[in-house]
UniProtKB/Swiss-Prot annotation:
This is Ribosomal RNA small subunit methyltransferase H. It is an enzyme of class 2 (transferase). Belongs to the methyltransferase superfamily. RsmH family. Signal peptide: none annotated. GO terms for molecular function: rRNA (cytosine-N4-)-methyltransferase activity. PANTHER family: 12S RRNA N4-METHYLCYTIDINE METHYLTRANSFERASE, S-ADENOSYL-METHYLTRANSFERASE MRAW. It catalyses: cytidine(1402) in 16S rRNA + S-adenosyl-L-methionine = N(4)-methylcytidine(1402) in 16S rRNA + S-adenosyl-L-homocysteine + H(+). It is found in: Cytoplasm. The lineage of its organism: Bacteria, Pseudomonadati, Pseudomonadota, Alphaproteobacteria, Rickettsiales.
């Protein structure tokens, strides 16, 4: 299914893009947030994503909004260096997009087509009017069996958002110690049967290497029974492994902290999360900036005292939005 950006209206209402503004879409994906921001004001968007497959969506957006959007293939935790022209490693310029798209689609990577930003005149730090994050895995990634994110599609055990990384889901299930597997599945997936699952994984890999998503899902299902639950027994395990492979919580912590440091006066930071681990990180960080005892209390203000959730209408149209939570802060000085 196509990726539908969640809480889109709510994000725009909080961000309130202005003509002449500069905004960062830290999780570009299919470009839904970037497109909405560009449509709502005569502004510029710097988009970030570590997944090179999103370039095709950037290409379409750049045709419609030439010179108003740039895509950086990077981790959003590096947002400060991305906006610092002296240390940026990769920049996708409009002139390079077609060439890069064809190379990526053929499965060949050539570093020399990535253009250095050492003299691109990229906006320096502390000069953006807003940063938005839509955290987690996208529908496009889940639906592509070759990416190995989902137990609904058979494919290699991968789960990397950045396929240049050397650590993938196969590393997790075939190389980690039983205790590490159990602790990760418990801490990142909230799976109370984590030790049983870890033992089953280790026993299975003694017989042969676990290679596919279906193999792993069936191993989990063999020791965890669904009963009356509508949730597949493999759901929490797959979530935990994906978070581990991509260091999602570490990236989120570093990303939102860095984003808060590059905002102009009145600049806004908006984060949409999809599970409690992510939301807790955002809530705790925002509170640390905005509570009276914080030295940053007079610098930041919460835009909404409680998180914003999707309406019943949106949930009916896009079930993925059911667990989405939006939190936002504004820089005051």
């Amino acid at each position: 299914m196509a990726h539908i950006p969640v809480l889109l209206k709510e994000m725009l209402l909080q961000l309130s893009p202005q003509n002449g503004g500069i905004y960062v879409d830290a999780t570009f994906g299919a470009g839904g947030y970037s497109k909405a921001i560009l449509e709502s004001a005569d502004c510029k968007v710097y988009a970030i994503d570590r997944d090179k497959t999103v370039i095709k969506f950037y290409e379409d957006l750049n045709i419609k909004y030439p010179s108003r959007v740039k895509l950086f293939i990077e981790k959003f935790s590096n947002i400060r260096s991305i906006l610092d022209s002296n240390s940026l490693e990769y920049l996708v310029e409009p002139s390079a997009v077609s060439k890069l798209s064809s190379i990526i689609s053929s499965g060949i990577q050539k570093k020399n087509i990535w253009i250095s930003a050492s003299s691109t005149g990229v906006t320096p730090s502390n000069t953006v009017d807003g940063v938005v994050f839509d955290i987690g895995v996208s529908s496009m990634q889940l639906d592509d069996g070759d990416r190995g994110f989902s137990f609904l599609h058979d494919g290699p055990l991968d789960m990397r958002m950045d396929n240049s990384s050397h650590t993938n889901a196969s590393t997790f299930v075939n190389a980690l110690r039983e205790e590490e597997i159990a602790n990760t599945i418990y801490n990142y997936g909230g799976e109370r049967h984590s030790r049983r699952i870890a033992r089953a994984i280790v026993n299975a890999r003694k017989k042969k290497t676990i290679k596919t998503t279906f193999e792993l899902a069936n191993i989990v299902r063999s020791v965890v029974f669904r009963g009356k639950s509508k949730i597949d027994p493999a759901t929490r395990t797959f979530q935990a492994i994906r978070i581990w492979v991509n260091d999602e919580l570490g990236e989120l912590e570093k990303g939102i902290k860095a984003a808060s440091e590059i905002l102009n006066k009145n600049g806004k930071l908006i984060v949409v999360t999809f599970h409690s681990l992510e939301d807790r990180i955002v809530k705790t960080f925002f509170k640390s900036l905005c509570e009276p005892r914080s030295i940053d209390c007079k610098v930041f203000s919460l835009l909404n005292k409680k998180m914003i959730k999707a309406s019943a209408e949106e949930v009916n149209a896009n079930p993925r939005s059911r667990s989405a939570k939006l939190r936002a802060i504004q820089r005051l000085s």
